[in-house]
Curated annotation (Swiss-Prot):
ATP binds at residues 30-37, 147-150, 184-187. InterPro entries: Pantoate_ligase, Pantoate_ligase_C, Rossmann-like_a/b/a_fold. It is an enzyme of class 6 (ligase). This is Pantothenate synthetase. It holds the Pfam family Pantoate_ligase. It comes from Granulibacter bethesdensis (strain ATCC BAA-1260 / CGDNIH1). The gene is panC.
């Protein structure tokens, strides 16, 4: 695996892969890697791509009340994980490389960026779009792989790529879960033992709501009951809603097709947990 810390080093390594006839897939991360990130790399390798993975904690997607310094970092561990997962290039830029002096171009995202996380974290998706556009420009991949756990982010990236006519195929990869159903996240390490024991209830409640929607037309009542149940178990729920999967608009009745998601965000102690559920995952799990 190549380690690239400067843009010329990255570009040379990518050129070597292309010269060898490889297609390039890109997996952007903020580090503190876990099995969820590894699943993205493996998904790309399974489609016969050589994989470039970035590790960069992007400051522009953190709001004023969010602690950038607290975000977990483990570069040595990340490099070891990427190497054994089969990554071809680890891209480890610093802040000055990503945001050089005089940097004056940003994004104001609309559409799928406006509600849910976008409403609660103003500017967050502007920062996500900014860094992803820069990374795409640096790596110039044929494809990029993102986890479905951050469903809204995935739709924002799809919108960004389409709007800017970027020649990058965007792939969503199913959420990776712990054995008890908790969605894997770098922030899970901040849960206390007591909170960790409670945390899987978030996914179980999504499953219960999903199965209830299969037999009841009243999504609003089902989601209202889910919020009450979670709050009663120690969560502080930001939202729990049935949405159209692509537009992220709220819907009242479960549609027949696959273009829907149950989404939720809730705080447990100091940790904010996100999760979502679609038809394919609902079919695999019992409530």
């Amino acid at each position: 695996m190549h380690l690239a810390r400067t843009l010329p080093t990255l570009q040379q390594a990518v050129h070597q892969l292309r010269h060898a006839g490889k297609r390039i897939a890109f997996v952007p991360t903020m580090g503190a890697l876990h099995e969820g990130h590894q699943s993205l790399v493996r998904a790309a390798i399974a489609q016969d791509y050589a994989v470039v993975t970035s590790v960069f904690v992007n400051p522009t997607q953190f709001g004023p009340s969010e602690d950038l310094a607290r975000y977990p970092r483990d570069e040595k561990g990340d490099i070891a994980i990427l190497e054994r997962t089969g990554c071809s290039i680890a891209w480890l830029p610093d802040v000055d490389t990503m945001y050089p002096p005089g940097d004056a171009t940003g994004f104001v995202m609309g559409g799928p960026a406006l509600g849910w996380e976008g409403a609660r974290r103003p500017g967050h998706f502007n920062g996500v779009a900014q860094v992803v556009a820069k990374l795409f420009g640096q790596v110039r991949p044929d494809a990029a792989f993102f986890g479905e756990k951050d469903w809204q982010q995935l739709q924002v990236i799809r919108r960004l790529t389409a709007d800017l006519l970027l020649p990058v195929a965007i792939h969503g990869v199913p959420t990776q879960r712990e054995e008890d159903g908790l969605a894997m996240s770098s922030r899970n390490r901040f849960l206390s033992p007591e909170e960790r024991a409670i945390a899987p209830l978030l996914f179980r409640t999504l499953l219960q709501a999903g199965h209830a929607l299969s037999s009841s037309p009243d999504a609003e009542e089902i989601c209202k009951n889910a919020i009450a149940a979670l709050n009663g178990q120690g969560f502080d729920v930001d939202y729990f809603a049935l949405i159209e999967g692509s537009s992220l608009s709220s819907i009242a009745i479960l549609p027949e097709g696959d273009d829907w998601r149950l989404i939720t965000a809730a705080r447990l102690g100091s940790v904010r947990l996100l999760d979502n559920l679609g038809r394919a995952e609902l079919a695999r799990f019992r409530a």
